[in-house]
Amino acid sequence: MKEQLLTKKILNWYDLNKRSLPWRKNVSLQKRQYYTLVSEFMLQQTQVATVIPFFNRFIKNIPTLKLLAKVQNKKLLKLWEGLGYYSRAKNLKKTAQTVTKNFKGKIPNNYEDLLSLPGVGNYTASAILAIAFNKPYIPLDGNIERVLKRYLYLKKEKDIQKDNLIKKKSIFGTSSRSSDYAQALMELGALICKPTNPLCNQCPISKNCKSLQKKDFNLTKNNKKNIDKYFLLKVYKKDQRYLLIKNT
């Protein structure tokens, strides 16, 4: 019952406050699936505000998955220019080609097949299933993680490990509006439960937020040590251009 109430509050807030984003347009199911695929690739490691103009330009020039599968690399990379992480663009095209060849041009609507696509990991697969196919998945991005950590007041390092957060997110429950609900949770983290200075007075679920009750909004960082790796590189220069090659 509590989960249903939580879901209702978040969706009611979303209906009134959601941002108007180009990939949220009321379009055909096929277009929505394509828009979701493109936007999720672009949003990997890039903020929403930065992505919007690139997404609009990309869709204007490559409006369908079929065209994406056949686009010349030069044109593709030109459209991606300025967005960075060009491997995303290359993987996006490879994904379009794989979908065209192996799935009859239709983006798969199950987790295992999505994970088989180039550049699609656990998060992207969950996001596509929720947003494009209205399936009951909650993709655990940085925004939703933050809401979860604060709402449950997760402070211990073992509590904020990814595996534990995946289990804890069940507190959010499910909705028949899975597409909207996944985006609502993302919006809540992006617009209200910000990394600093969260807008608790505007939060639809603040009443039961443990961090608000304790007046402690600091987030415990995952202190899992990263391993530094070092490589020797060969540098070649020609006509003011540089080429770096890993020395194996």
What are these model-predicted stretches?
Residues K2-Q4, W13-L199, I205-N208, Q213-K214:
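Catalytic cores of DNA base-excision repair glycosylases
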Residues I10:
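Non-catalytic nucleic-acid substrate-recognition regions in nucleic-acid-modifying enzymes
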Residues Q213-T248:
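N-terminal strand-loop-strand
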